[in-house]
Amino acid sequence: MSLRSVVKKIIPKDLFAIVEPYGHWLEAIVENIAFGFPMRNLKVIGITGTAGKTTSSTLLAHMLRESGYKVALMSTISIDYGDGKGPRSNNTRMTSLGSYKLLQAVKKIKANKVDWLVLETTSQALSQHRVWGVPYTVVGYTNLSHDNFHYHRTFERYRKAKLMLFKQANRNRRGMRIGVINSDDANSEYFIKAISNPITYGIDSGDLRATDLVLSPSGSTFTASIGGDKYNVKSNLPGKFNVYNSLAAIGIARSVGLDKNQIEQGIASLKSVEGRMNTVDRGQDFGVIVDYACTPEAFDQLFAAVKPMTKGKIISVFGSPGRRDELKRPIQGEIAAKNSDIIILTEEDDRDQDGQQILEEIAAGVVKAGKIRGKDLLMIHKREDAVEKAINMAKTGDLVLLLGKGEEHVIITNKPGFKAAPGHIFNEATDTIQRPYNETESAIKALDKLKR
């Protein structure tokens, strides 16, 4: 058992929550000294927010690469060291790495002489000082909504943690002190005040605005305008929420010097973002979409995007992670039930929590919305079986939504009663087991079996 696990068991939970960030802070300082401050002279773009971080970061990194820059990217789904070998899966299950692993990665990145590092930055990483010493040149903010309350406890603490990114960027004398902020978000003013050079974006408001918006199942087209500049945008990323993600990337790209052609071509040339609204097509006569949506707001946005393009029934498969924002479970259940014809609840990283209890908490919201157990509400704990059931139920014109996992490569389960097998990894720090799993592969397997 790790030292952290021992300390966590000895001292009260509330006290541990108070002292833990200081431990991370001290750790970050010591490790920066030990590594020789590898972040020095590195140009870093940080993006934070509840939703949209990964898509905005991936899109921005792609635009910079297409414009001739050497770019490294660290995101929820992948890490690209800027060595020309492309992204590797981020199997740590952490959007922002701990300071030691972060600095290890940065040493590799710096050796590759990159022009930019795009760093997806979470509220937990900020509040735990994991990113202490990161010289943010430009920062971006997507939105703030219901998530991570399991850690921050209150919305105000969550918001203050996000604000730390802007304060850190504003302290960087060598940086541009630019913050690109979603002005359509209710909390935008809070962040605008914290940065010397704010640039706002939005559909309803902002310095950078999207007009002439046309949404389709295959993406969107719109005009992005700021000052006297206009960008004719064609995006392959469907959904109104991806218009916001594109605007965030445009605002940052423009700030660091990309021109009109580079911005337009950069967006148009990105075909998809791994685990975000990805279609699985094996020649079947119904749709299958894999998406990482895992908050009430993300559910709202996703259903708003897919309902207009679905002729048949919507079958939604999802769960909720153990020890993570338990308040959202019935809320997501109700949203999904109101927008789906059939709900199949399943595992999504139970960790050390009882899986059936998690499903029952989601089911409370599903039942509230009118679904009936055994009829249009099913519970199938093993995720592979739930995916197969949904695909077997689908008819011509239907849509199967596989939500919450995206392109993650493991499922975290609790240790008691679980039989370990080859490929399973025991995590001593959390007393859990990771077993290999990929949503797209699971869907392909079920679809191929259906064809036979």
Task: Name every feature range the model reports, one short phrase each.
Residues L3-S183, E189-S196, L247, A253, ...:
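Phosphate-binding loop of NTP-binding sites
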Residues S2-K8, L15-V19, A248-N261, Q265-V273, ...:
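ATP-dependent carboxylate-amine ligase
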Residues S78-D83, S220-S225, V410:
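Short polybasic amphipathic segments
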Residues S127-Q128, F149-H150, S188-Y190, Y231, ...:
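Glycine/Thr-rich phosphate-binding loops of Rossmann-like dinucleotide-binding domains
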Residues D83-N90, S235, I412-P416:
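Short acidic, glycine/proline-rich loop/turn micro-motifs
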Residues S96-L103, R159, V243-S246, P296-F299, ...:
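Amphipathic alpha-helical transducer elements in NTP-driven molecular machines
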Residues T50, T76, N182, I203, ...:
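Cofactor-binding loop segments of dinucleotide-utilizing enzymes, especially the Rossmann-like FAD-
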